């Protein structure tokens, strides 16, 4: 049996975390991480410098070679590079795993009918295998099995710093590109038994978890295609929604930046990437109520 060779696209925070977990897993995988620059703690013998762009016409043979000789590909690139990776894996029939929560990519996949209950003849692909969508929707689906009818399903997820020291009540610990995308897209819900989409940064609520007060609000992509799947499978669900958990006061500031000032994406990414301090002392909250 050939040794499993895993290709990781992206050497940022998430790509490096995946790499380190695979290295210590004990399964002795061959692992190669590809990016334009080596950014973090990756063994140089496991790294390949590779130009990865949005324009397919600019891709060279090196990208194709990287993909087609791997057992599987894990995509840890910024969301706007997903199309390149996804389509190349389909072309060479390489299993593809994607952690992103990009609503635009979901719609593209659905339009192409690459993911369906009767799909045949294309490679195995698994979008939405991160935290949200991913772990949180798996837990929610498991909890639903004990109910014949679900009146309300609330999925609340927050990736937060353990402490906050700024007025934003937030410190970055992952992709700034992904954060901005999450705060700007449409949000998928089931409302009164019907699939619908609502704007990000609305639906504000307060909640208390383990004695700590938080706020939550709609953000894009965190539920993936879960709401649409429940409707298509004719599950008896009245209201289903996903919201991001933050410390109280965060929404007022981001609503001002995103909606009142209507700052362009590149400026928003720059603010979160270069002007909001990072932290490695983070915590993840998953709160599901059914």
Predicted regions and their residues:
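Conserved N-terminal Rossmann-fold NAD(P)-binding element of oxidoreductases
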Residues: 6-10
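Hydrophobic/small residue at the entry helix of a nucleotide-binding pocket
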Residues: 14
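NAD(P)-binding Rossmann-fold cofactor-contacting core
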Residues: 30-43
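Rossmann-fold cofactor-recognition segment
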Residues: 45-57
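Conserved Rossmann-fold cofactor-binding substructure of NAD(P)-dependent oxidoreductases
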Residues: 55-67
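Beta-loop-alpha module in the N-terminal Rossmann-like domain of NAD(P)-dependent dehydrogenases
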Residues: 72-91, 104-107
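Rossmann-fold NAD(P)-binding glycine/threonine-rich loop
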Residues: 100-125
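C-terminal catalytic/substrate-binding lobe primarily of soluble NAD(P)-dependent oxidoreductases
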Residues: 146-290
């Amino acid at each position: 049996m050939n040794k499993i060779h895993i290709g990781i696209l992206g050497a940022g925070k998430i790509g490096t975390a995946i790499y380190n977990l695979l290295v210590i897993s004990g399964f002795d995988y061959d692992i190669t991480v590809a990016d334009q620059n080596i950014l973090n703690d990756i063994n140089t013998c496991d790294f390949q410098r590779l130009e990865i762009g949005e324009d397919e016409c600019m891709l060279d043979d090196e990208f194709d070679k990287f993909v087609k000789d791997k057992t599987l590909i894990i995509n840890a690139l910024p969301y706007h590079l997903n199309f390149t990776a996804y389509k190349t894996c389909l072309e060479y029939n390489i299993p593809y795993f994607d952690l992103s929560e990009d609503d635009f990519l979901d719609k593209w996949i659905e339009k192409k009918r690459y993911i369906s209950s009767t799909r045949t003849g294309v490679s195995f692909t698994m979008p939405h295998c991160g935290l949200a969508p991913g772990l949180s929707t798996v837990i929610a689906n498991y909890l639903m099995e004990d109910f014949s009818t679900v009146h309300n399903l609330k999925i609340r997820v927050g990736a937060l710093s353990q402490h906050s020291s700024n007025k934003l009540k937030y410190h970055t610990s992952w992709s700034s590109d992904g954060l901005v995308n999450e705060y700007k897209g449409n949000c998928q819900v089931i409302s009164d038994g019907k699939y619908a989409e609502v704007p990000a940064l609305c639906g504000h609520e307060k909640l208390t978890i383990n004695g700590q007060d938080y706020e939550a609000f709609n953000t894009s992509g965190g539920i993936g295609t879960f709401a649409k799947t429940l409707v298509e499978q004719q599950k008896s669900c009245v209201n289903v929604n996903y919201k991001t958990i933050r410390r109280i006061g965060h929404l007022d500031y981001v609503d001002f930046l995103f909606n009142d000032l209507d700052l362009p994406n590149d400026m928003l990414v720059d603010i979160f990437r270069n002007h909001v301090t990072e932290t490695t002392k983070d915590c993840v909250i998953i709160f599901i109520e059914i």
